[in-house]
Amino acid sequence: MSLMQFSGLLVVWLLSTLFIATLTWFEFRRVRFNFNVFFSLLFLLTFFFGFPLTSVLVFRFDVGVAPPEILLQALLSAACFYGVYYVTYKTRLRKRVVDVPRKPLFTMNRVETHLTWVILMGIALVSVAIFFMHNGFLLFRLHSYSQIFSSEVSGVALKRFFYFFIPAMLVVYFLRQDSKAWLFFLVSTVAFGLLTYMIVGGTRANIIIAFAIFLFIGIIRGWISLWMLVAAGVLGIVGMFWLALKRYGLNVSGDEAFYTFLYLTRDTFSPWENLALLLQNYHNIDFQGLAPIVRDFYVFIPTWLWPGRPSIVLNSANYFTWEVLNNHSGLAISPTLIGSLVVMGGALFIPLGAIVVGLIIKWFDWLYELGNREPNRYKAAILHSFCFGAIFNMIVLAREGLDSFVSRVVFFLVVFGASLLVAKLLFWLFDSAGLIHKRTTSLPQAQVEGKL
């Protein structure tokens, strides 16, 4: 890459970043937080944060990358995607009407809410315990990270249930919403994330998500400033780099440490070059249509229920890894959101996907506002827990693609909804048995004496 080509890419990158960052800043000033703000920051991180890292790798370490015209296509496709997404998100589909009282779809009381978070926590802890009994601490047993996907590891399906510890702790926080509950959420979820990191063999998702939710709650409540958020972000990047070194068993120093930091940070937070690789091999892609979305559900179907279930799930990530890159190392390479759309339908699917994503984020913001307006604090805690709990799925959406997002959000919805139903059933059984008693609030002694 020549300096002239780099200069052209830099101009496009600066204009695109300024465009998205400006819209995000205006939205932040208007509402402080909603899921449009979160997705916009996530989109910036995924598709634009990696460009400076790639530039240093190219000019400092002479690392090979895709041709400049392909990198330009990747940057422009990301900017155009966001433009279509933003217009879709801001377009009102129907006239705003004055809220009229309507019968709620469901309601929650104190006992049902506490039962819900206990059930969610139980699902996570029992899954971790069973996985640990089968495999022990994989971080200290396996020689490479790719081995966690091999036949040496049993009960892999249980990992999908670990994440429900975070929604459980979110319910606990939203019932109190003070600084102590906020700090308790951080300590409990990060401790659980470190435990799963050691048990699973290097999976950092639970730690990243817990830390991100903690920061956004702090921004919403005004407990941390934007500068503190930036400082925490830098700390998070360094922390994720250290965990990655431990995961891959790397011992580096000097220039090698700097080089390793650059490419691991880029691959962890901003796999934008994967989109460039996909566009570079555009002519080799056999467009898959909506099949990757259907196939991604296969992993949630146990073999005892479907004995003939395909052992290889050809979702967009696996198609990109195996068929496009011819990489059979055992790890799936993230195609990114835009890359998954290209795999499914080529360039035509990029604006269509942007419209779909705009509607998805609009729905989550509607649900979030519903929780903000809800007078029943127990129901509000459940709604907010569901919305913030889905942050993991939004990260999957940006990094892995639309197919992975759809299957995971449906799974999350089913498990979360089933926990609610079980909590309501248990409450009905306890109430029928006479085990539920109304809480009586006693008046302070001074007020009692004043009434005598």
UniProtKB/Swiss-Prot annotation:
Pfam families: WzyE (PF06899). Keywords: Cell inner membrane, Cell membrane, Membrane, Transmembrane, Transmembrane helix. The keyword Cell membrane applies. It is a multi-pass membrane protein. Pathway: Bacterial outer membrane biogenesis; enterobacterial common antigen biosynthesis. Coiled coil: none annotated. Its main location: membrane. It is found in: Cell inner membrane. It comes from the Bacteria. The keyword Membrane applies. GO terms for biological process: enterobacterial common antigen biosynthetic process. One of its GO terms (cellular component) is plasma membrane. The chain crosses the membrane at residues 6-26, 37-57, 63-83, 118-138, 155-175, 181-201, 207-227, 228-248, 341-361, 378-398, 410-430. Probably involved in the polymerization of enterobacterial common antigen (ECA) trisaccharide repeat units. NCBIfam families: PRK02975.1. Belongs to the WzyE family. Probably part of a complex composed of WzxE, WzyE and WzzE. This is Probable ECA polymerase.
